[in-house]
Amino acid sequence: MLLAADLDCLSASDLKARALTLLGEVAALPQVVAEQRAEIARLKGLKGPPSIKPSGMEQATKPRPSASGSRRRGRGAKRVGAAIEDRVLAAEVPAGSRFKGYETYLIQDLIVRPVAIRFRRERWLTPDGRTIVAPLPAGIDGHFGPELRRFVLAQYHQGQVTVPRLVALLDAIGIAVSKRQVVRLLIDGQGRFRAEAQDVLRAGLANAAWVTVDDTGARHKAQNGTCTHIGNDRFAWFGTTGSKSRLNFLDLLRAGHSDYVINPEALAYMRSRSLAGPLIRQLAEHEAKHFADRAAWQAHLDQLGISALKVTPDPTLIATEGALWGSVKAHGLIKDTVIVSDDAGQFQVGRHALCWVHAERLVHKLDTFTDHHRVAQQRMRRLIWWFYADLKAYRRDPTPARRAALRARFDRIFKRQTGFATLDRLLARLHANKAELLVVLDRPEIPLHTNGSENDIRCHVTKRKISGGTRSDAGRDCRDAFLGLAKTCAKLGISFWDYLGARLGIPQTSAVPNLAELVANPA
């Protein structure tokens, strides 16, 4: 560090360079303070939303319609889903008038009224002393009918109505129900829905060419946690856990399986994470390769002496991550699936691609202090936007020549020296991610961004804002399952209302196939 007396020895250009460096450090301090305040708020349970403004790159690079097709297409007529009831309205006319037919006027209405049914079940005593009672109609489970249960589930999960407001609404309609009973309607007996949500995840991970992932904060049992989203254009799945580590993400990728497996994929993962060679040989040469649960795996690590090692990187952690990855592969999940993320460390597993919107946002958020800085930043943003637009064009029509040209152009853009030190360091960092940013050149079917995950996860953020956290494991699992099922139905073009009706056995409801089968077998 220079003393004040040493500043006299510096030239004007050196002083200017040092001043710019200090300005950059000072500009970074508010971000550091904001992150520390956010961490303090998180520890206090007061985590606030991030303030991130979009750069506009995605919208600006959308292909423009041709001149011939520039007119906006009309919305078209809205089809009426209900059966139409005809009513003839008579007019008062003077004598001598001639009848000229009818003028049609279509309206839609909604009838919401309470219904109470007392079933009088016949009881018979057989000659051999047995009592036979007439069974309840299909769909009756408890003292609330399937239509009421469908209404409650749709309002709470799709309509984002809170439990107190739902109770008030039902009371106003004329349904005698308490808050505790509504909570039971939302949680009790929903195992089949949770199982179907898990099956959707397995089908998606087993058959998808790509998935996007994202996470957000979640409160459970008064503790901070994380909700992770996994999905693509055909399914969505949410899972709330207490951690956002890579270990947690690998656990979620098992899609409900609880085993740990040592196979070639697991060993390759351990090598990529720099686990010591002798430890890898121990695991590879041992006869035990499959472990039913966490306890069996931990006992195996203890037997080999791996868990007793206190070195960096942690061998227990890396070996466990590898065994989880081995389990994922053993169950036929993530076969050749590309995982697209925002560069969060926990998502960097398997074939990994990065979001271009998040990459450009780093350049967009840079603080500039001179005209030279601002010109350099804007020039680089324009170059990145043009490159992004050409990547979109390549996805629509991939060719080997364009692939090679884009690779060379990437190097020219991100190896550029602008004279803005902070920007140059950022460009070098982005260039180091070349392989993950250009996965699309080999796999043009994958998206260039994670906007799908960010859009999907907003429903969870909304639920968190209006309802807070969950108090029971069943409540947490039901919330995640139904939010995922509702999003999956929307992506498959299925009405969530009809889906609930089919699953609850409501009469005269169209059958809805298992969602996992639809995800696994696209039409």
Predicted feature locations:
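Short, flexible loop/hinge motifs at secondary-structure junctions
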Residues: 1-143, 213, 260-319
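Catalytic center-proximal scaffold of phosphoryl-transfer enzymes
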Residues: 34, 121-125, 130-523
